[in-house]
């Protein structure tokens, strides 16, 4: 029993250390996300993937799909891909001035399937997997080499909404006021809310502006420099 308690306390201490630094969102590098997915999918002979060699087969497509989900680049519930975020996982050559044009030309050839293109569980997301694999190939072959470090990404719309709800509870703002938008600015605890959101999201966030634009979504558009509507 004492040993179990010690293990639990050690685990809690580790979690506090991690979240004390990151507060809420932990962004991984491509290699870290890939390492996770190789374990999730129980991929045999992962050597080729560790050296970033991805053949055009189902295993590679499943792996890329898992990595992109793990990195929060794609939201399957909304069928939304953040192309600008995707680009941050690749480093273009400093002397290359045409990488954006090449990548956009490649993306123009990528077909966007419906969210679910089959009623059979075994084929769930198969079309999306193929699309995301082709998008990955556009970035990998046209944009730049895979980034070795974890880039700083802004939270997704759904993540930011969750952070705002959590922070409202922490600082004592009711759900009614949270949905009140501009009325929040006169609340005595409002000044604490933006700071909590900033710390947990990892950056400066204009709360009221976000609430007024909460219906905005990222889409798979044919321009890697601006993927917001």
Curated annotation (Swiss-Prot):
SUPFAM superfamilies: Insect pheromone/odorant-binding proteins. The keyword Secreted applies. Keywords: Disulfide bond, Olfaction, Secreted, Sensory transduction, Signal, Transport. One of its GO terms (molecular function) is odorant binding. The keyword Nuclease does not apply. It is found in: Secreted. This is General odorant-binding protein 69.
